[in-house]
Design a protein with these regions (language model features):
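Fe-S-dependent hydro-lyases/dehydratases of central metabolism
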Residues: 1-260
Length: 260
């Protein structure tokens, strides 16, 4: 947060999204901010654990059920009686609490991108690849059951503002070269820990030649370099995708020229 007399500085996309969610005019890398979450996604991998903890609370309460999206996608159809029981627990809880629920409609992140994610949002997902939402200019990050439960009950959480690694893309992919090749090449250069707790930001004229499928693939894999999140500038391709799916952006951010 900005204190009295502190000079303002340019902000990255990640910093701007966190500042918006925290109700602050400015944040910088390393700050810890209390944020209001825009959306909370969970799948059948761990939701039953979250429900179990929720039921042990003295006064259980969901802050905003409209922000919750639960998706059964990891084991369809269920592969054991134990899995079937955990999915039933998830299904029954979602119905009882009027939580948006999907089953057998696709991988959770694809379902989120097609139906819910909009630019400028801060989203927690109980899955490591929640960073995929950066393809639409949203700050998505994976959390565990305890952090998810806290956000579900309070509507808030804390976030340490990540530093940013910016990748300016040029040209376009050659025939036979795909988005997955591009991001794996980048990760190969920076290393599996090369973006630990960083935001990997993608921009440049080369971005415009990438389809939404390309962008989702790139952002999805950024966690393999340890990234806290991945973010792309919102352009005509992203806006056309939103329009096609009947949604409007919450906020479209770009990094300031003097951001560090």
């Amino acid at each position: 947060a900005v204190t009295a007399g502190e000079a303002k500085h340019g902000m990255t996309i990640a910093e701007k999204i966190i500042a918006r969610a925290a109700g602050l005019s400015q944040v910088k890398a390393g700050d810890i901010a209390t944020v209001t979450l825009d959306r909370l996604m969970s799948n059948d991998g761990t939701t039953h654990l979250t429900i179990g903890m929720y039921e042990k609370l003295k006064n259980p309460h969901i802050a905003d059920k409209d922000k919750l999206v639960w998706i059964v996608d990891h084991n369809i159809p269920s592969d054991s009686p134990k899995t079937a029981a955990s999915q039933k627990k998830m299904r029954d809880f979602a119905k009882a609490n009027d939580i948006k629920f999907y089953e057998g409609e696709g991988v959770c992140h694809q379902v989120m991108m097609e139906n819910h994610v909009v630019p400028g949002e801060l989203i927690f997902g109980a899955d490591s690849r929640t960073c995929a939402y950066g393809a639409l200019g949203a700050f998505g990050t994976g959390v565990g059951c305890t952090d998810y439960l806290y956000a579900m009950v309070t509507g808030t959480s804390w976030v340490m503002v990540p530093g940013t690694l910016r990748f300016n893309l040029k040209g376009k992919l050659n025939d036979g070269v795909y988005a997955r090749d591009l991001i794996l090449s980048i990760i190969g250069k920076i290393g599996a820990n090369g973006a630990n707790y960083k935001a990997m930001e993608f921009a440049g004229e080369g971005l415009h030649s990438l389809s939404m499928a390309d962008r989702i693939s790139i952002c999805n894999l950024c966690v393999e370099a340890g990234a806290k999140t991945a973010l792309m500038e919102v352009d005509d391709v992203a806006m056309d995708y939103l329009k096609e799916h009947g949604r409007e952006p919450k906020a479209c951010f770009t990094s300031d020229d003097d951001a560090v």
